[in-house]
A protein has these predicted regions:
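Cys/His-enriched microdomains
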Residues: 29, 33
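Basic, often amphipathic N-terminal segments
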Residues: 36
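Conserved AdoMet/S-adenosylmethionine-binding subsite of the radical SAM
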Residues: 58-76, 80-158
Length: 158
């Protein structure tokens, strides 16, 4: 895993209108899923090696310091520019430790991922949910036409 320097981890959102969150956190840069529809691949983000995942150096210390300076709790989006549960997360635990900080500072969280690794941190989502909003959004990619049907009840699928 390569690391890149970071000045900030907790970034204020320009508008809450699109996603309902007032801050974003991206502990990683790049994504290995290769989704053609991903707008994070856009040239405007100046990441020519988007398919290569790198971690941000000292991300947890920076996040802790930035959360400590907050006057009021934030509602934080994770996964806007990189999947927080990429394959490297299983070993690095950056997302898990960031969730511990988000919980400790009474913030809410909205997470976007394609990974079932999210269930590893269900205890933290439950703890955060006791004091703040939690939204977990999972993208399911399939070639099974039956799963694509509008209105499918995923609780009833095998």
């Amino acid at each position: 895993m390569d690391y890149i320097p970071a000045k900030h981890i907790l970034l204020r959102s320009k508008s809450t209108a699109w996603f309902g969150t007032d801050h974003t956190v991206n502990l990683y840069r790049g994504c290995c899923h290769g989704c053609l529809y991903c707008d994070s691949r856009s040239d405007c983000y100046r990441n020519p090696n988007f398919d290569r995942v790198t971690a941000k150096s000292d991300a947890l210390r920076i996040l802790r310091d930035e959360l400590a300076r907050k006057v009021r709790p934030a509602f934080i989006a994770m996964g806007a520019m990189s999947d927080p549960y990429n394959p490297f997360e299983e070993e690095l635990l950056l997302t898990r430790h960031a969730l511990e900080l988000i919980d400790a500072y009474d913030c809410g969280v909205s997470v976007d991922t394609k990974s079932d690794l999210i269930v590893r941190d269900i205890d933290l989502y439950q703890s955060i949910q006791a004091h703040s909003p939690v939204i977990c959004k999972l993208t399911v990619t399939t070639v099974d036409e039956d799963l694509v049907k509008e209105g499918i009840d995923f609780d009833k699928t095998d």
